[in-house]
Amino acid sequence: MKAFHFLRIAAVVTLLYFAGHTAGMPWTPYTDPEALAIIEAMKNHSFEAEGLKGTYWDFYFGFGIIISLFLFVQAAVLWQVASLARTDAIRVRPIIVSFLIAFIINAALAWKYFFAVPVVMSGVIALCLAISLVLASRSQTALRGASTDKPGPAGS
């Protein structure tokens, strides 16, 4: 398999991460009476921030939607980067590194603050990105070897 294959896998897993995160909306446990009381307090306590009046619930819910949007965009960009990697894997390495760092941090934060599903999703994505980075680097080594091969005169 080549770098672009693992980038495509990372894109699909990121899309699944987006779908799971979005399906979990509104991202709260509704079974615990104490949790319900906290959620109600979040919805009822309003304050002003940067000239806008809102609640903690507005921030919580809004950030959840923003995260879903960014996961969707990341999936789309990874798919596009995979297309670029098909013909020029070397040049997409800095992009792969950026996403790799982001998903490693995502996995660490999910481990600390959330639960297993986002940890596993981020970990699988990071693994695919790491493998694609190694494979992209190998394609550069192969190109270097090919560029040093000089054709000799005919018949030699």
Predicted segments, located by residue:
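N-terminal signal-anchor transmembrane alpha helix
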Residues: 5-31
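Physicochemical signature of membrane-embedded alpha-helices that form the seven-helix bundle of GPCRs
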Residues: 13-16, 63-69, 95-98, 121-124
